[in-house]
């Protein structure tokens, strides 16, 4: 294993120390328990956004803390969910009195620990809500989830809902918008190589030189199938059609009923695409894929979407939700109405994403 690290046990702490040293005007770090928060938190009268998950996916989530996105992020160990005490402490830190919205990727550990933290925060008098992101069309269940995994739409939700909170949306409005973004977004990913978790020291899985994994998860979870290597155009066509041709997905998700002070099941269905829809298109590197290859992929994706009568209004290309050094890409398509486009265009200033200021 070759990595630019010192001691395996110090990887997460040292990268956070580097983040704080590089961006002292944007973020602060609390080390016990571990969380990242924006320098001006809590912002009085503004809904605060908190997210988190295992480290190894940088810049998500800590790199998206700042004006126009997250108020706080809770990084666990590599590919390991943050603990309830981390999430609870971060929630207390950023609460400015207007409530806290937790944006949670659908991985079993994340879901359980955020639910526990929400209950602790509620018992402490904090007004809090959580919304689940489950946009991965590759599989319905996996090693880490019941139901679809939460992947690329998470980044888009943090940007859109973060801007809405900055603009003065209430907690209920932010939750409704986040729910809409999740129902409008779909993703799928592929891997050409595995990744190596520092504490493990060997690849998570093996892929031959002439193979790729279709439908991979961001922790190296198995996808739909392992296939012989194809051209980029062939792979991208498979990915885009897997998103566009996937039927409506109905599932029950647990959400916190603040008035009833209990968890309740809600039935949600994602929204299929149709000709004329406006999109935000997100082509993402899994960590080891260069921009040149991302743009080759984007070229083919744009061609297919145009043939289907879908209109790309905005895009994001780069490594924003990674899997350590994995070679591979993911594609996320988000149906975008005027509200979503307006908040996408709004100013953002974080270590990992910045425009408009």
PLM regions and their residue ranges:
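Mixed-charge interfacial surface used for oligomerization/domain docking
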Residues: 169-294
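N-terminal amphipathic/basic leader segments beginning at the initiator methionine
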Residues: 1-49, 338, 347-357
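Short alpha-helices
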Residues: 133-184
């Amino acid at each position: 294993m070759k990595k630019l690290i010192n001691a395996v046990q110090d990887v997460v702490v040292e990268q956070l120390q580097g983040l704080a040293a590089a961006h002292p005007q944007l973020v602060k770090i609390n080390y016990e328990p571990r969380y990242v928060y924006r320098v001006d938190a809590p912002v009085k009268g503004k809904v605060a956004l908190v997210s988190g998950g295992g480290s190894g996916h940088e810049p998500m989530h800590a790199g998206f803390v700042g004006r126009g996105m997250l108020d706080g992020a809770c990084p666990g160990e590599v590919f390991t969910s943050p603990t309830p005490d981390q999430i609870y402490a971060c929630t207390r830190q950023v609460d400015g009195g207007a409530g806290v919205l937790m944006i949670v990727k659908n991985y079993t550990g994340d879901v359980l620990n955020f639910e526990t933290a929400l209950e602790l925060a509620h018992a402490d008098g904090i007004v809090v809500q959580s919304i689940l992101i489950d946009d991965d069309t590759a599989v319905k269940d996996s090693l880490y989830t019941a139901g679809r995994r939460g992947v690329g739409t998470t980044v888009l939700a943090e940007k859109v809902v973060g801007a809405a909170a900055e603009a003065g949306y209430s907690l209920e409005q932010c939750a409704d918008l986040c729910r809409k973004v999740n129902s409008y977004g779909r993703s799928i990913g592929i891997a050409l190589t595995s990744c190596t978790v520092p504490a493990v020291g060997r690849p998570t899985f093996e892929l031959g030189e002439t193979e790729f994994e279709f439908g991979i998860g961001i922790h190296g979870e198995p996808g739909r199938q392992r296939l012989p290597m194809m051209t980029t155009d062939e792979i991208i066509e498979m990915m885009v059609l897997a998103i566009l041709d996937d039927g409506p997905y109905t599932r029950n998700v647990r959400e916190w009923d603040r008035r009833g002070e209990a968890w309740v099941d809600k039935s949600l269905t994602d929204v299929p695409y149709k000709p004329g829809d406006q999109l935000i298109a997100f082509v993402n590197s899994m960590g080891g894929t260069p921009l040149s290859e991302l743009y080759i992929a984007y070229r083919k994706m744009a061609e297919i979407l145009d043939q289907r009568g879908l209109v790309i209004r905005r895009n994001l290309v780069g490594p924003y939700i990674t899997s350590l050094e994995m070679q591979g890409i993911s594609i996320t398509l988000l149906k975008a109405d005027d509200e979503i486009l307006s908040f996408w265009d709004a100013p953002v200033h974080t270590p990992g994403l910045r425009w408009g200021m």
